[in-house]
């Protein structure tokens, strides 16, 4: 197969391939970018593989950076762009089901491609637009099928994270997993416990943000892989609820909304501990737990001004997005009206602060000062007090007199 037109991302990088070939080596576009071009999807990263060894690659170009030279990767700075160029390589026995014990550089493209995970990711493209397909990846692309390169059992035993990648690709590409590949994923799912939680989180997160995320979750359920992921053991019912409880065409607006609804569907009692088990950042934990709290408030009643002040318009909109996907009542105009009606959006908007209370009223730093500031803040938010210096002073005097 030959591409009639090279996408602009590849055209810009063609001089890189040309320079390498003029130096006497082979060079090709490889991996996900080739797959995405053939599927007419946006290209994110342009990866180049070459028969030149790292030091040989560095000798060809004036500006290079050693970003992973021990694995054969050199970053080339050329024509205003940055390109990762990796030497063809083979990999020795894997340790810990996630990384090869040794990487060996080779001159053969086919040897390099055979170590890759799925056939649709094992395609290469030369400078003339000719697709090199050693493992029937083009047929799999045409039939929307995800199939492991070579023996599926070996691919997943080498790197168990490929199981999560399989679920993610099913979700992002809307592909079905080929039977032998699926069976190997199922039988090797216990190895997911050997994978770092951070790497599993990255793949699961990408799955949830994919347009066909239900397909990825369904495959995960069918493989029973969830039993080997943090907080998901014996959670099949909750995962099924996650799939069926939202409208068919719904996709999550952002990562916070996705993980919040995962925990809502699973009826997680302690969201923070659940997210800690996934080793997420403290900021992520705080935002998602607040989002769940606001979702539960909305289950009981309509939003009020204090809700929008405390949680923010953006978070309230994420809640309404989930409600809309469940065919529940939604009122985005109400959120906008409440936000517009707020005299302040955070305590720093208040014209009077603690320093004024200490200076003008002789208050001491401590709990009483903090309580007075909270009273002022709440009164302004609820519309009982204007955000005006003189008015607030009068309010404070009255409060201190009682």
From Swiss-Prot:
<feature type="binding site">
    <location>
        <position position="35"/>
    </location>
    <ligand>
        <name>ATP</name>
    </ligand>
</feature>
<keyword id="KW-0819">tRNA processing</keyword>
<keyword id="KW-0692">RNA repair</keyword>
<dbReference type="InterPro" id="IPR032810">
    <property type="entry name" value="CCA-adding_enz_C"/>
</dbReference>
<dbReference type="Pfam" id="PF01743">
    <property type="entry name" value="PolyA_pol"/>
</dbReference>
<keyword id="KW-0067">ATP-binding</keyword>
<comment type="function">
    <text>Catalyzes the addition and repair of the essential 3'-terminal CCA sequence in tRNAs without using a nucleic acid template. Adds these three nucleotides in the order of C, C, and A to the tRNA nucleotide-73, using CTP and ATP as substrates and producing inorganic pyrophosphate. tRNA 3'-terminal CCA addition is required both for tRNA processing and repair. Also involved in tRNA surveillance by mediating tandem CCA addition to generate a CCACCA at the 3' terminus of unstable tRNAs. While stable tRNAs receive only 3'-terminal CCA, unstable tRNAs are marked with CCACCA and rapidly degraded.</text>
</comment>
<feature type="binding site">
    <location>
        <position position="159"/>
    </location>
    <ligand>
        <name>ATP</name>
    </ligand>
</feature>
<keyword id="KW-0479">Metal-binding</keyword>
<feature type="binding site">
    <location>
        <position position="47"/>
    </location>
    <ligand>
        <name>Mg(2+)</name>
    </ligand>
</feature>
<feature type="binding site">
    <location>
        <position position="32"/>
    </location>
    <ligand>
        <name>CTP</name>
    </ligand>
</feature>
<keyword id="KW-0694">RNA-binding</keyword>
<dbReference type="GO" id="GO:0005524">
    <property type="term" value="F:ATP binding"/>
</dbReference>
<keyword id="KW-0547">Nucleotide-binding</keyword>
<dbReference type="GO" id="GO:0000049">
    <property type="term" value="F:tRNA binding"/>
</dbReference>
<dbReference type="GO" id="GO:0001680">
    <property type="term" value="P:tRNA 3'-terminal CCA addition"/>
</dbReference>
<dbReference type="InterPro" id="IPR002646">
    <property type="entry name" value="PolA_pol_head_dom"/>
</dbReference>
<feature type="binding site">
    <location>
        <position position="168"/>
    </location>
    <ligand>
        <name>ATP</name>
    </ligand>
</feature>
<keyword id="KW-0548">Nucleotidyltransferase</keyword>
<protein>
    <recommendedName>
        <fullName>CCA-adding enzyme</fullName>
        <ecNumber>2.7.7.72</ecNumber>
    </recommendedName>
</protein>
<feature type="binding site">
    <location>
        <position position="168"/>
    </location>
    <ligand>
        <name>CTP</name>
    </ligand>
</feature>
<feature type="binding site">
    <location>
        <position position="116"/>
    </location>
    <ligand>
        <name>CTP</name>
    </ligand>
</feature>
<feature type="binding site">
    <location>
        <position position="165"/>
    </location>
    <ligand>
        <name>ATP</name>
    </ligand>
</feature>
<feature type="binding site">
    <location>
        <position position="162"/>
    </location>
    <ligand>
        <name>CTP</name>
    </ligand>
</feature>
<dbReference type="Pfam" id="PF12627">
    <property type="entry name" value="PolyA_pol_RNAbd"/>
</dbReference>
<dbReference type="GO" id="GO:0004810">
    <property type="term" value="F:CCA tRNA nucleotidyltransferase activity"/>
</dbReference>
<keyword id="KW-0460">Magnesium</keyword>
<feature type="binding site">
    <location>
        <position position="162"/>
    </location>
    <ligand>
        <name>ATP</name>
    </ligand>
</feature>
<keyword id="KW-0808">Transferase</keyword>
<dbReference type="InterPro" id="IPR043519">
    <property type="entry name" value="NT_sf"/>
</dbReference>
<dbReference type="Pfam" id="PF13735">
    <property type="entry name" value="tRNA_NucTran2_2"/>
</dbReference>
<feature type="binding site">
    <location>
        <position position="116"/>
    </location>
    <ligand>
        <name>ATP</name>
    </ligand>
</feature>
<dbReference type="InterPro" id="IPR050264">
    <property type="entry name" value="Bact_CCA-adding_enz_type3_sf"/>
</dbReference>
<feature type="binding site">
    <location>
        <position position="35"/>
    </location>
    <ligand>
        <name>CTP</name>
    </ligand>
</feature>
<feature type="binding site">
    <location>
        <position position="165"/>
    </location>
    <ligand>
        <name>CTP</name>
    </ligand>
</feature>
<dbReference type="InterPro" id="IPR032828">
    <property type="entry name" value="PolyA_RNA-bd"/>
</dbReference>
<dbReference type="GO" id="GO:0042245">
    <property type="term" value="P:RNA repair"/>
</dbReference>
<dbReference type="GO" id="GO:0000287">
    <property type="term" value="F:magnesium ion binding"/>
</dbReference>
<feature type="binding site">
    <location>
        <position position="159"/>
    </location>
    <ligand>
        <name>CTP</name>
    </ligand>
</feature>
<dbReference type="InterPro" id="IPR023068">
    <property type="entry name" value="CCA-adding_enz_firmicutes"/>
</dbReference>
<feature type="binding site">
    <location>
        <position position="32"/>
    </location>
    <ligand>
        <name>ATP</name>
    </ligand>
</feature>
<feature type="binding site">
    <location>
        <position position="45"/>
    </location>
    <ligand>
        <name>Mg(2+)</name>
    </ligand>
</feature>
């Amino acid at each position: 197969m030959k591409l009639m037109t090279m996408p602009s991302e590849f055209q810009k990088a063609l001089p890189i391939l040309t320079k390498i070939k003029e130096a006497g080596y082979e060079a090709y576009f490889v991996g996900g970018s080739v797959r995405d071009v053939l599927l007419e999807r946006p290209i994110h990263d342009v990866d180049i593989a070459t028969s030149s060894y790292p030091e040989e690659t560095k000798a060809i170009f004036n500006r290079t950076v050693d970003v992973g030279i021990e694995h054969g990767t050199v970053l080339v700075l050329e024509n205003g762009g940055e390109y990762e160029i990796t030497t063809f390589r083979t990999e020795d026995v894997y340790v810990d089901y996630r990384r090869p014990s040794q990487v060996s550089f080779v001159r053969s493209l086919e040897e390099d491609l055979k170590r890759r995970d799925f056939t649709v990711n094992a395609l290469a493209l030369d400078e003339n637009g000719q697709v090199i397909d050693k493992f029937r990846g083009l047929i799999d692309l045409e039939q929307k099928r995800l199939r492991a390169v070579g023996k599926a059992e070996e691919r997943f035993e080498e790197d168990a994270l490929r199981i999560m990648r399989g679920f993610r690709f099913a979700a992002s590409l809307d592909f079905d997993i080929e039977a032998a590949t699926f069976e190997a994923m199922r039988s090797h799912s216990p190895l997911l416990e050997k994978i770092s939680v951070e790497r599993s989180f990255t793949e699961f997160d990408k799955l949830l943000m994919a347009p066909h995320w239900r397909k990825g979750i369904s495959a995960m359920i069918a493989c029973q892989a969830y039993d080997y992921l943090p907080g998901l053991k014996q959670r099949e019912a909750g995962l099924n609820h996650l799939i069926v409880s939202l409208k068919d065409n719904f996709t999550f607006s952002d990562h916070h909304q996705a993980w919040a609804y995962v925990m809502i569907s699973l009826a997680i009692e302690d969201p923070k501990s659940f997210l800690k088990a996934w080793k997420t950042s403290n900021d992520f934990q705080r935002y998602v737990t607040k989002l769940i709290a606001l979702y539960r408030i909305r289950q009981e009643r309509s939003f009020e001004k204090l809700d929008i002040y405390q949680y923010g318009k953006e978070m309230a909109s994420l809640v309404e997005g989930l409600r809309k996907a469940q065919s529940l009542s939604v009122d985005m105009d109400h959120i906008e009206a409440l936000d517009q009606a707020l005299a302040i959006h955070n305590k720093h908007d208040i014209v009077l602060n603690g320093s004024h209370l200490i200076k003008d009223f002789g208050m001491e730093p401590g709990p009483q000062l903090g309580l007075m500031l909270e009273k002022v803040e709440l009164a302004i938010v609820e519309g009982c007090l204007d955000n005006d210096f003189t008015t607030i002073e009068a309010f404070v005097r009255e409060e201190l007199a009682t």
